Each structure stands twice: as structure tokens, then as C-alpha cells.
Regions:
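Conserved NTP-donor binding/palm subdomain of two-metal-ion nucleotidyltransferases/polymerases, i.e.
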Residues: 1-60, 66-176
Length: 176
């Protein structure tokens, strides 16, 4: 009785969060320049591909990656379409711009989904980092979608990177 109710509630909440993420992806597809290849990463990529590992997720953000040379153009398009970065101090802004693998988190007004716009999958300061150009050579098309995803082996590599570089061990084991 009670446990079954909790499980049904969790499944419904997961379905809701997945739908919210899909709505955000649709808005992003309209906002980003069509000529810029955009890669969906991590959980949003699993959902986009309808992978088994996507089931039961509670997505709260979407991670996208563009080539470094397309970063300013993609950011400008997002800002022009209403996304805005969190207010951060000059030190943190410089950190994101010079040393991180992503821009400061962005959000669209009225949306609960945070957007992380990456230009590679590991921080610039990471000891081990993949050749981002190679990641872009094996991108996979998701049928009927504007977005691309990493090659399945690169998705595993990315999950492994997060497993060993992040502190959220349990969630990252599931992704791997």
C-alpha cells in the first residue's frame, strides 16, 4: 500500500521532470543557431536517446556542448532568446571563462531547468583530458532531433570522468 504509493509518486515525478527537460530542449533547439552543432551530454542525452539508464531520472539541468569556436555565438543566441547567467563575482566569472570547461550556469525566466553550456567535457585544469576535436568527429545523430550526442564509447568515457572527478559517487555509478 504505502510503499507502492511512494513508488508510483516517484515514477510520476520522474515522468514530469523528464517532460520539463524535453520542453527545455525544444526551446533550446529554437534558440541556438541551426548551423552550430550542439551536443547533448549526460542525463539529458540518455533521455533524448530513450536509453534504459534514463528511466527514473530526476533531471534538473541540461548540459550542452559546442565547439570552443562556437561558444560565443551560442551564448549570444541564448542570451538573445532570454536565457541569463547567474549573477557571479568577477573572480568566478574569470574562472569560468578561462579555466572551466563550461560557462556560468544559465536559466530561462520561468524555467526550473539550469543550462550548462560546455566547450569540452573536462576542466581546462584537469590532469587528464580528452582531445575535444576527436569527440566531435564521432558525434551521433538522434533521429528526428536537432541535437547530437557523443558516440556511445565517449558517453561512457564522460560518465567515467564524472565518476572520478565529482563527489556524487552513487549517481555517477548509475550513469556508468
Amino acid at each position: 500500500g504505502c510503499v507502492l504509493g511512494h513508488l508510483r509518486s516517484a515514477a510520476a515525478y520522474s515522468a514530469h521532470r523528464t517532460q520539463v527537460l524535453r520542453v527545455e530542449l525544444a526551446a533550446l533547439a529554437k534558440a541556438l543557431p541551426a548551423e552550430v552543432p550542439v551536443v547533448v551530454l549526460k542525463g539529458a542525452a540518455y533521455i533524448l536517446q530513450d536509453l534504459e539508464s534514463a528511466r527514473g531520472r530526476l533531471p534538473g539541468d541540461v548540459d550542452l556542448m559546442v565547439a570552443y569556436d562556437d561558444l560565443k555565438r551560442a551564448e549570444a543566441a541564448l542570451l538573445g532568446a532570454g536565457w541569463a547567467a547567474e549573477e557571479i563575482n568577477a573572480y568566478d566569472q574569470r574562472y569560468y571563462r578561462e579555466w572551466s570547461h563550461e560557462l556560468p550556469p544559465m536559466r530561462r525566466p520561468g524555467s526550473s531547468v539550469e543550462l550548462d553550456l560546455h566547450h569540452t567535457i573536462t576542466p581546462v585544469t584537469a590532469r587528464l583530458k580528452p582531445d575535444t576535436a576527436l569527440l566531435f568527429t564521432d558525434l551521433q545523430v538522434v533521429e528526428g532531433k536537432r541535437f547530437l550526442v557523443l558516440h556511445p564509447q565517449d558517453q561512457i568515457l564522460h560518465a567515467a570522468v564524472h565518476l572520478f572527478q565529482d563527489s556524487e559517487l552513487f549517481a555517477n555509478l548509475r550513469d556508468l
